[in-house]
A protein has these predicted regions:
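Catalytic histidine-centered segment of alpha/beta-hydrolase-like enzymes
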Residues: 363, 383, 387-402
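Short alpha-helix in the alpha/beta-hydrolase fold that links the catalytic acid
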Residues: 351, 365-374
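Alpha/beta-hydrolase-fold enzymes
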Residues: 1-46, 51-52, 182, 186, ...
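Short beta-strand/loop motif that positions the catalytic acidic residue
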Residues: 349, 355-357, 361
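Conserved acidic catalytic loop of the alpha/beta-hydrolase fold
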Residues: 156-162, 170-189
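Low-complexity, highly charged intrinsically disordered N-terminal segments
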Residues: 25, 29-107
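Short, surface-exposed "cap/lid" segments of acyl-processing enzymes
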Residues: 82-84, 88-158
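The conserved beta1-alpha1 loop
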Residues: 119-123, 195, 357-358
Length: 422
């Protein structure tokens, strides 16, 4: 009886959110609110400028440092989020390359079923732990258990210091791939990108298509003009030039606040909903899941304001990528001492692609992701539309029962099986 009463809030929360969400969503998209949002952000920039001129310090930077230290300490002490054991095989500035293994300290390189490794590229926003939240809700474990040699890019806690442009992230993906190619003695690698990480993977594959065996995208933005989420509306109205001129960093707690502000009710109830989404009816597991999700939600690293500016202006505001007008600096090609500017043409992508779209995604609109397979030149391409939200794709019971087995099966069909001599 107690168990039944304990889990009835799941239905109540869903009903409560549904009945209040529509009106709040309308208000948060209104012209008045968007103008007030822009004015508010500009006032923060102006206030910080006055403080620096008159007092020689930035209260916003000081507050960010305090919040960051407090939450990092809290999260580290609260719960261990990493579930699947891994080794750090190399560190490039602040970026780490993780190599996952099974239940022992011996990596699976010699015993994996599939010879084609998989590199996971998470978004620069938040940390990668949401795709490895718990043993039975881990995307990493799904691939690992199926026999894939799994690697992960961990962008780190201090991205603002060493990743200043989109090019820097693309360069790190390339360096990671080169390291994995040498480690595994494989010419081509499977690539899986999530959210903004998926967008970065699209850019990478347009430049280095020949290095990739297949590409999995999950909730990846492409047609930003069609992204009608609240976050996208705010990005299009964000005074990013003024912010970039004043600050060197896009503070992590600013990003956390944006996720909260987009819909405080949903943001507050979602973590309860995700934690309650269990078929085991285990109160201990509910509390454990809630702690992990809460820790992840408040663990957003600072980004370089220069990178944030480029991503917002070139993609959210100008929509350059889908129109093949985005240009980035190649790290290797130099002309007269200058880095070579390369245009990103998505038609260069010819590899097999699986595009995973959440039909209820409120962070990346499905309309922004669905055009991916229409733009690339790949003949082997598939879209899976799943009745789920952005985070639910990663951790919901339904997704792990009905979505990820399909994804694993698709990747198995694109990967070579290891010979016994390997």
């Amino acid at each position: 009886m107690c168990i039944v009463l304990f889990f009835t809030p799941y239905a109540f929360l869903s009903h409560f959110v549904d009945t209040t969400n529509s009106k709040l969503d309308e208000e948060l998209r209104s012209k008045d609110f968007l103008q007030n949002f822009k004015n508010y952000m500009e006032s923060i920039v102006n206030l910080d400028s006055v403080q620096k001129q008159n007092f020689g310090y930035s209260s916003l930077s000081s507050i960010d440092s305090l919040i960051d230290k407090s939450l990092t300490s809290y999260n580290n002490n609260l719960v261990s989020i990493n579930q699947t054991p891994n080794n750090v095989i190399v560190q490039i500035d602040g970026t780490r390359i993780l190599h996952y293994f099974g239940g022992s300290n011996e990596t699976l390189t010699a015993s994996t079923k599939y010879g084609t490794p998989l590199l996971i590229v998470y978004a620069p926003i938040n940390r990668y732990h949401i795709i490895d939240l718990s043993p039975n809700r881990s995307i990493v474990n799904k691939f690992n258990s199926a026999g894939f040699d799994v690697f992960m890019i961990d962008w780190g806690e201090e991205q603002s210091k060493d990743k200043l442009t989109i090019s820097d992230y693309v360069d790190d993906i390339d360096q990671a791939l080169e390291i994995i190619r040498k480690t595994t003695n494989k010419e081509k690698i499977n690539l899986y990108g999530y959210s903004w990480g998926g967008t970065l993977c699209l850019i990478y594959c347009a430049l280095y298509n020949s290095k990739i065996k297949s590409l999995i995208l999950q909730s990846a933005n492409l047609d930003f003009d069609k992204d009608d989420t609240i976050i996208a509306e705010w990005m299009r109205n964000f005074p990013v030039e003024k912010f970039n001129d004043e600050f060197k960093e896009m503070f992590g707690h600013f990003i956390d606040s944006a996720f909260l502000m987009r819909n405080p009710i949903v943001h507050t109830t979602d973590r309860l909903k995700y934690a309650l989404d269990t078929k085991e009816y285990d109160i201990f597991r509910f509390v454990q899941n809630l702690a992990k999700i809460s820790a992840w939600i408040t663990n957003t690293p600072d980004l370089s304001s220069q990178f944030f500016r480029q991503f917002v202006i070139d993609l959210y505001q100008k929509n350059l990528l889908i129109n093949n007008q985005l240009s980035i600096q190649e790290k290797k090609g130099k002309v007269n001492g200058q880095k070579e500017i390369t245009r990103v043409d998505l038609k260069n992508i010819t590899i097999p692609i699986l595009n995973i779209v959440g039909n209820k995604d409120d962070l990346v609109s499905p309309k922004s992701s669905l055009p991916i397979n229409d733009i690339v030149s790949s003949r082997d391409k598939k879209t899976i539309e799943f009745p789920s939200g952005h985070i639910e794709l990663c951790i919901s019971y339904d997704a792990h029962q009905n979505l990820w087995p399909q994804v694993v099966e698709w990747l198995e069909s694109k990967s070579e099986i290891k010979s016994k001599s390997m």
